[in-house]
Amino acid sequence: MLILVTNDDGINAPGIKALSRSLARVGRVAVVAPEKERSAIGHGITMHKPLRATEVTWEGPVEMALAVNGTPADCVKLALDALLDEEPSLVVSGINMGANLGTDVLYSGTVSGALEGCINGRPSLAVSLAGEGGVDFSFAADFTSRLAGVIIKRGLPAGTLLNLNIPCLPPGEIKGLAITRLGRRRYCNTITRRLDPRGRAYYWLAGEVEDLDQEPDTDIGALGQGRISITPLHLDLTNYSYQQELAAYLSFLWPGQGNR
């Protein structure tokens, strides 16, 4: 079986290297990842310039290791449609340096890599380790490979992917595993305005995270309690509970139509 691996930290990031080594115990691995960091790129795809896939040297057993001058979604799309000779049994995106929790999933290139696999009908998994700089990816990689084996055997529902967040703790201090829902967080942005040497304004985007929903059943809450969080996500973003109410108060826009 073949496992496609990508990320948003770039092909030289330590997380993807640890992940590919561990997944090689489960199946054959193909690495197709951005040539440079593309964090917070969301689900952007490249439509206005050529994409190039360049072979790179890789430590460990892989079918291929290619760096792409595009986004994580580009990498998965390109791999599935042009680069691979067979369909992968699983798409894994990660291991990201830093958690992807709550509304982070809407910005995350890591999650979008897995999302692109899901759009194309492949079981898919996004993996993030809640740490910064110099962290040890070995436990996260080992846990991901065990989870990958289960997913390959059991599959996932159509249109569903998993978002995995692992605490940056020694394995003995992790409190267990939680199946969670998305929490809610926002970034209280501080925009810094500066001037370049020519006197033209430019801006830096920064800010602090504010967790608005961190109940114990959320991914944010679970990680805060030292537990591994697995959140099933699906492609359908429809708010079904609001459809009838919306139809009722917008019916005047097209009288007599109703909610067909």
UniProtKB/Swiss-Prot annotation:
Top-level taxon in the UniProt lineage: Bacteria
Record keywords, A-Z: Cytoplasm, Hydrolase, Metal-binding, Nucleotide-binding
SUPFAM superfamilies with a match to the protein in the record: SurE-like
Cofactor(s) the protein needs: a divalent metal cation
InterPro entries noted in UniProt: SurE (IPR030048), SurE-like_Pase/nucleotidase (IPR002828), SurE-like_sf (IPR036523)
Enzyme type, top EC level: hydrolase
Coiled coil: none
Major location (coarse): cytoplasm
EC number in record: 3.1.3.5
Taxonomy of the source species: Bacteria, Bacillati, Bacillota, Clostridia, Moorellales
GO terms, molecular function: 3'-nucleotidase activity; 5'-nucleotidase activity; exopolyphosphatase activity; metal ion binding; nucleotide binding
Family note: Belongs to the SurE nucleotidase family.
Name listed for the protein in its UniProt record: 5'-nucleotidase SurE
Cofactor note: Binds 1 divalent metal cation per subunit.
Cellular localisation: Cytoplasm
Disulphide bond pairs: none
Annotated binding of a divalent metal cation, by residue: D8, D9, S39, N96
Reactions catalysed according to its record: a ribonucleoside 5'-phosphate + H2O = a ribonucleoside + phosphate
Organism: Moorella thermoacetica (strain ATCC 39073 / JCM 9320)
Pfam families xref list: SurE
Cross-referenced Gene3D superfamilies: Survival protein SurE-like phosphatase/nucleotidase
